[in-house]
């Protein structure tokens, strides 16, 4: 066989023209130590803070410590298959979780993976768990109410859409119950809810899911769960994942509510991670950036304007503002609200609801201390009817508390003092409310009208609960159309006063 040089040269030219010399740059590192879920990696010179690191066997880690030559990362999941000398790779991506309407009614872990055996999630998109909070120009003032369904909160410590209201108290004082009742109260509204459970028993989470399902509120709620048996990194990430899911609705011109139950557990998990990473400990062994841990999370809760929503959706949604309201919960020890994490959260949030053990044990539920509970948004987050009817409630309770402590040392009291004490007792009784029974705006307005116009003076304190139940049944039975109008209008004028007076005057209590 004879080879021609011209054919050989043509073949070589053809092969050269078709040769593809594309290559992919990949940042590579080597594991040099493993301990308690923390890996130290040599290399990865171009890695970002909080970047995902690809490990062998489809495992990932998050880069938290960026030193000169070493990267400290925390493994998400089991780390027993890892060993020193293994190669790892940077991904160039921050951790992302699924978002969208299809998450409603589902129970997820901190990574957005389903835990409820209902199959895979058909998500709209993935979003990074760490995002920059909206700027000052993008925000609106908080002037729309978010009804909790609790008489004591809606009248004295009102919460507005986009607000951050801290719920603080010792264990077993009704913090979670208050937040869950608030979620239940949103079932007939367009407010989407996210409940983030951090460091609780899985059985407790199951009970919460069952209660929401029982009250038809689960279909409007996303449950994000990092239980006590989960790793510290999942407990640390869960609030950020839940916040990202809530931002999906906020940025598209909808209203959403998120509950963090509770952030003291997240702080403990972050302290554990930081100590394992050999970060220098500060007060109560927490790292120096513990304040930033919570501030960057809670600042993402806001009410954003129409321009922000329009720009975010690229013109698909117009003339709509969105909001993300946060109810962070923090647990205190022995009523000490001056400890490190509670004081941090008090300074970050727009108000706080203090729940006290002695009030809870004496039968006052919710066990709110009105003297030190406050909403920094104030009356601007209340409906007109509730604002005008509840104006003197806090003052009356303050006078009652002052007089009741004075009355312990005096046997003879004048008639006016006795009347004030009796009036205060009846206000406390009327503000009591059972769990899982949020109250509509019209019912709250009717009861506050009864308090303001001294209708309760005719009955004994022990009969207030019975009086309340009978009055509400009477209003529902004979004036249901009008009660429904109050729920929609929020206005308090002469016509409303006349109608409320008619309901009260037509009611006979036996």
From Swiss-Prot:
Uppermost EC category: translocase
Chief location bin: membrane
Keyword 4Fe-4S belongs to the record: no
Catalytic activity: ATP + H2O + 4 H(+)(in) = ADP + phosphate + 5 H(+)(out)
Site residues, Required for activity: 373
Mode of membrane association: Peripheral membrane protein
Keywords from the named record: ATP synthesis, ATP-binding, Cell membrane, CF(1), Hydrogen ion transport, Ion transport, Membrane, Nucleotide-binding, Translocase, Transport
Keyword ATP-binding: yes
Cross-referenced PROSITE patterns: ATPASE_ALPHA_BETA
Family: Belongs to the ATPase alpha/beta chains family.
Oligomeric form and interacting partners: F-type ATPases have 2 components, CF(1) - the catalytic core - and CF(0) - the membrane proton channel. CF(1) has five subunits: alpha(3), beta(3), gamma(1), delta(1), epsilon(1). CF(0) has three main subunits: a(1), b(2) and c(9-12). The alpha and beta chains form an alternating ring which encloses part of the gamma chain. CF(1) is attached to CF(0) by a central stalk formed by the gamma and epsilon chains, while a peripheral stalk is formed by the delta and b chains.
Name this protein carries in UniProt: ATP synthase subunit alpha
């Amino acid at each position: 066989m004879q080879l021609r040089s011209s054919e050989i040269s043509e073949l070589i030219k053809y092969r050269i023209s078709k040769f593809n010399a594309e290559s992919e740059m990949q940042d590579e590192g080597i594991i040099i130590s493993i301990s308690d879920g923390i890996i130290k990696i040599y290399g990865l010179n171009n890695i970002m803070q909080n970047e995902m690191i690809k490990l062998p066997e489809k495992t990932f880690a998050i880069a938290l410590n960026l030193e000169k030559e070493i990267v400290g990362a925390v493994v998400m999941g089991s780390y027993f298959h890892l060993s020193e000398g293994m190669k790892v790779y940077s991904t160039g991506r921050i951790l992302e979780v699924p978002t969208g309407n299809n998450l409603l009614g589902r129970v997820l872990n901190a990574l957005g993976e389903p835990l409820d055996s209902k199959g895979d999630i058909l998500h709209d998109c993935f979003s990074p768990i760490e995002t920059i909070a909206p700027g000052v120009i993008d925000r609106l003032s908080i002037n729309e109410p978010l009804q909790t369904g609790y008489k004591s909160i809606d009248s004295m410590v009102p919460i507005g859409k986009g607000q951050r209201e801290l719920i603080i108290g010792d264990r077993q004082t009704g913090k979670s119950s208050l937040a869950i009742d608030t979620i239940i109260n949103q079932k007939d509204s367009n407010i989407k809810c996210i409940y983030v459970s951090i460091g609780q028993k899985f059985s407790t989470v199951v009970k919460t899911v069952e209660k929401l399902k029982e009250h038809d509120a689960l279909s409007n709620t996303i449950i994000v769960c990092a239980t006590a048996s989960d790793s510290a990194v999942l407990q640390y990430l869960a609030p950020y994942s839940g916040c990202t899911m809530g931002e999906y609705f906020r940025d598209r011109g909808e209203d959403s509510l998120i509950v963090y139950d509770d952030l003291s557990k997240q702080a403990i998990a972050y302290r554990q991670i930081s100590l394992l990473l050999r970060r220098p400990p500060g007060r109560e062994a927490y790292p120096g950036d513990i304040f930033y841990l919570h501030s960057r999370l809670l600042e993402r809760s806001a009410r954003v304007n129409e321009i922000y929503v329009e720009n975010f959706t690229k013109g698909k949604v117009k003339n709509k503002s969105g909001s993300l309201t946060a109810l962070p919960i923090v647990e205190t020890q022995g009523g000490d609200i001056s400890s490190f994490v509670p004081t941090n959260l008090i300074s970050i949030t727009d108000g706080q609801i203090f729940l006290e053990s002695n009030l809870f044990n004496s039968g006052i539920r919710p066990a709110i201390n009105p003297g030190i509970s406050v909403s920094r948004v104030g009356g601007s987050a209340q409906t007109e009817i509730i604002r005008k009817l509840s104006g003197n409630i806090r003052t009356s309770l303050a006078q009652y508390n002052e007089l009741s402590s004075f009355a312990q040392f005096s046997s003879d009291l004048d008639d006016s003092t006795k009347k004030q004490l009796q009036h205060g007792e009846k206000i406390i009784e009327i503000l009591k409310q059972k769990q899982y029974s949020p109250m509509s705006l019209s019912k709250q307005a009717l009861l506050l009208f009864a308090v303001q116009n001294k209708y309760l003076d005719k009955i004994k304190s022990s009969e207030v609960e019975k009086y309340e139940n009978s009055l509400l049944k009477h209003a529902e039975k004979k004036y249901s159309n009008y009660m429904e109008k109050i729920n929609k209008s929020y206005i308090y004028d002469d016509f409303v006063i006349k109608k409320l007076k008619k309901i009260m005057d037509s009611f006979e209590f036996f």
